[in-house]
Every structure is written in structure tokens, then in C-alpha cells.
Amino acid sequence: MAYVLVLNSGSSSVKFQLVDPESSATDTPLVSGLVEQVGEPQGAVTVKTGGEEFKEELEIPTHSFGLDRAFSIMHEHGVGPTDVEVIAVGHRVVHGGRLFSEPQLIVDQIESMIEDLIPLAPLHNPANLDGIRVARKLLPEIPHVAVFDTAFFNHMPPAAALYAINNDVASQYDIRRYGFHGTSHEFVSQQVPKLLDRDPGHVHQITLHLGNGASAAAIRNGRPIDTSMGLTPLAGLAMGTRSGDIDPGIIFHLSREAGMSIDEIDNLLNKRSGVKGIAGVNDFRVLRERINNEDQDAWLAYNIYIHQLRRFIGAYMIALGRVDAITFTAGVGENDTEVRQDSLYNLDMYGIDFDKEANLVRSKEPRMISTADSQVKVFVVPTNEELAIAQKSAGIAAMAREAGLY
């Protein structure tokens, strides 16, 4: 059996999975794991395989050291990159800018182009690039593929993609709506026509990726026409720690009146806002407990979250003209029954006949939570970004081999 090693490299961590690209979305990967606290005195490498977990706590000075140690632990249990057939290494890259609309076989030139995009994603692309460079050195004989979070949204209509600011400034500094969570939105949106038993080219849908980060997308006939995140993942819905859309004048006000620096405002809006900024927590399970205990801040945070979500659902229903399906995915979207119910409350006049009993069913399988005769079908579809990356990477790797590059 052939596998793809999927890597998601952060500034102080590396998540990894060995995935069969032919598997289904609910199948367990052969290996999953995490290298954490890179550069800190107390790091750890965790490897899960065959229903068992193996964890080693140690200092991890670099990404290279941590990933090499992870491969060694995998090898000790017969599932290392040299023990099984690995046909590709797929790398999640957050920002592809205008340069990348499709996955790319990684060569030195592609590395340089990803580096050129660092100003658009200063927190994410450097870490993604570190992971690419480390993995290419450790596994030089295997094709490496970059899969970009922004790629799915790269051809949105100009009216949705561009901001109403000076053209010259926007062009000079690459300012536009790029969108994020693209791999997830694309993956989920491809499952919906199968559930509807419809041609993908004739489905209008809204996808809602609701995790700690959250985004919405309007997709017409397989192509996105709008999305909630923008130049950065800060825009759009209220999220776990991010503000989502705000009046840009708030930034000037905080600078002038509070004397806050750009970095301080950046930290406030990205890490100390959203649900956490209002309620003090961003775990929706804890938030629900506090709401049940009549915590007013928790109730306010939840209401703002739902209000923003309903605003985008309504806007995208208008943008699409006809909506065949609304789909919830990611941690909150897949597991929080009340978020799903409250976000679609009292929308029967718009063709949404919500099934409260179906909504309460717990399952890892895709499922419908509207009634059978609802004009707009509502689904819960578990996302699997790693599988999507594996599938895209396997395809690019196959073409590279056919071209004699490997």
C-alpha cells in the first residue's frame, strides 16, 4: 500500500500523518503525530499508530531534530518513511498569494517563491518553509508537494476578491481577499453533490468551516464566488481568539487614544479577541457550561458569534441566488449541535426545514440534519484536510514520475 506523508509545520511544532490517499475521509491514518515545543527546554514527540501512542519528552532544538526523532520512533514500530512505501510528502502552506492556484511540485524555485510571499503571511509561511526545507533534506528521493490554503479562492470574481481602496496601493502591496481554509472548503464542497446525488456543476452551496478559526464560503457550481476571510485569516466571522470583521477605524482609535503599537493591536485582534476576548475562554464546551450557569459574558460572546454567522449565511444566500445546501464542518461545526441549530433558527421562510432530532445524532459520517423535503438541505460533513493534501500530492507526484523527474 502506498502512503503520503502529510506535514503541517508551525513555528514551534510539526503535525504529521501517514495517509493512504485512496482511503475514505473517516479512515484512521496509518500514523499521526506531533512534534511540539520546538526550541523550548521541554519538548515532546508523539507518534500514534495501530491504536497505540508513543510519547518521548526531550529537548527539541530544531524542527530538523524533532522530525528526525519522529521518523526514528516510527521506524522502531515498523511504520517509518523507509519501512512503508511513501510516494510523496505533502506540505500544507498557508499563503500562496496570486502565484499559486494549484498544488506545486517543490523545487528550489518554488521554495523561493513561497519565501517571497512571507510579507503576506509573516507568522505562517516562514514556519511552513522551515518544514519544507527540513523534510527535503531528510527525504530527498521522494517528491515534495506544496498545497496552498488560499489556492481554492484564487479565481473569485473581482467584485468579491478586491477591496474598495486605491487601486495603485492595492496592486503595489498585493492587497486583496485571498481567503483561507481553502483545502477544507474544497474537500467538503466536493462531498455535498454526492450526498445530493447531483452533478457538481449544478450545485449552489454554503460551506461553514467552524473551528477555533472560522470561515464561510459561497460556492456556485464547484467554484467559490465569495469567502469571509480576507488578506489575512483575521477577517470575517467572530472566532475563538480573532475578532473577525471590525470597523478599521478601531485600529486608529486604539493607536491614538490608547497609545497601542501596531504589534500590540495585532496581538489584541488575533489572540485576545473573539469569543475569548469577551468570555475569557475559547473552548466552546467550557463556554456552554458557563452559559448554562448564567454567565452573562459567555452568553454575550455566543450571541455575537451566532449573529456574525447568520449575517454571512444570509449574505451568501443572496449572492448565490439559489442555495441547494448548507454544510457545517471542522471542530465546532461537526460537534456543537446548538451552534448549528441557532445559526439556522427560524429560517424556514427561506426554504430551510431544520431537523432537530437528526441534528442531535453523533456520528463521524457525513449526514443530513434537515428534513427530507427541505428545499435547502443542511449537512454535517467531517473535514479531512490531511486526506485532501494527500490526494493532491499523490497526483502531482505521479505526474513528476511520468515526466522522469523522480
UniProtKB/Swiss-Prot annotation:
Pathway: Metabolic intermediate biosynthesis; acetyl-CoA biosynthesis; acetyl-CoA from acetate: step 1/2
Needed co-factor(s): Mg(2+); Mn(2+)
Gene Ontology CC entries for this record: cytoplasm
Assembly information from the UniProt record: Homodimer.
Function of the molecule: Catalyzes the formation of acetyl phosphate from acetate and ATP. Can also catalyze the reverse reaction.
Name by which UniProt lists this protein: Acetate kinase
SUPFAM superfamilies in the cross-refs: Actin-like ATPase domain
Lineage: Bacteria, Bacillati, Actinomycetota, Actinomycetes, Mycobacteriales
Annotated EC: 2.7.2.1
Gene giving rise to this polypeptide: ackA
Residues given in the record as substrate binding sites: R92
GO-annotated biological processes: acetate metabolic process; acetyl-CoA biosynthetic process
Residues binding Mg(2+), per UniProt: N8, E385
InterPro entries reported in the protein's UniProt record: Ac/propionate_kinase, Aliphatic_acid_kin_short-chain, Aliphatic_acid_kinase_CS, ATPase_NBD
Pfam families: Acetate_kinase
